Amino acid sequence: MADVLKLDGIRKSYNVGTPVETEVLHGIDLTMQRGDFLALMGPSGSGKSTLLNIIGLLDRPTGGRLLINGEDTGQLSDSALTHLRGHAIGFVFQYHYLISAFTARENVMMPMLVDRGRPDAAMEKRADELLDRVGLSRWRNNSATNMSGGQQQRVAVARALAMDPDLVLADEPTGNLDTKSANDVFELMRQINRERGTTFLLVTHNDDLAERCDRIVRVVDGKIAG
């Protein structure tokens, strides 16, 4: 199977107004293949958020190589990184970040609108198909504020899939939900992973959910533990 994500010796240092650099990631190696469903765990301050920002092409590493679908992202311009991020990576966050004035359908269409600039029938069809897949066809014209927390997070999952990404980064996607809704959202992502072969990297503090992933990677003090 092809590698969707490959990290080779990723390091990250910060210089916060002093001549001394602080290194927060120390040579991270990680490989994910198409169809992987991986849990990323670690205590607060371990470097998880920094690592996720680098994987999501929101920040550049200080050293090492990051490859997405075999492409060395260190060789890309900022605009090329933005294009790659928009097409290859989907994001689901703990707080859904839906636009409250928009309907569920309009929220799912947002990544396509950013990419293409103008709504069309194909976008609406794609959004409706994704809302059907996450079980929200009946709510497609509801505003984001007129849905439950679990429904809002399902819309966020559909939005993450709008550009048919190879990799979805889910940062504590169930952390703001009750137990049943959290399980439902997790199972939805798991089903999509199995049906579409979409690779998922799930950041979670929930041991039960992590145990149901294919693999658990723990980050401690800026390194992969074990």
Swiss-Prot record:
It is found in: Cell inner membrane. It comes from Rhodopseudomonas palustris (strain ATCC BAA-98 / CGA009). Belongs to the ABC transporter superfamily. Lipoprotein translocase (TC 3.A.1.125) family. The complex is composed of two ATP-binding proteins (LolD) and two transmembrane proteins (LolC and LolE). It is a peripheral membrane protein. One of its GO terms (biological process) is protein localization to outer membrane. One of its GO terms (cellular component) is plasma membrane. This is Lipoprotein-releasing system ATP-binding protein LolD 1. GO terms for molecular function: ATP binding; ATP hydrolysis activity; transmembrane transporter activity. The keyword Transport applies. Its EC number is 7.6.2.-. Residues 5-225 form the ABC transporter domain. ATP binds at G42, P43, S44, G45, S46, G47, K48, S49. It holds the Pfam family ABC_tran. CDD domains: ABC_MJ0796_LolCDE_FtsE. Part of the ABC transporter complex LolCDE involved in the translocation of mature outer membrane-directed lipoproteins, from the inner membrane to the periplasmic chaperone, LolA. Responsible for the formation of the LolA-lipoprotein complex in an ATP-dependent manner. Keywords: ATP-binding, Cell inner membrane, Cell membrane, Membrane, Nucleotide-binding, Translocase, Transport. PANTHER family: IMPORT ATP-BINDING PROTEIN, LIPOPROTEIN-RELEASING SYSTEM ATP-BINDING PROTEIN LOLD. Disulfide bonds: none annotated.
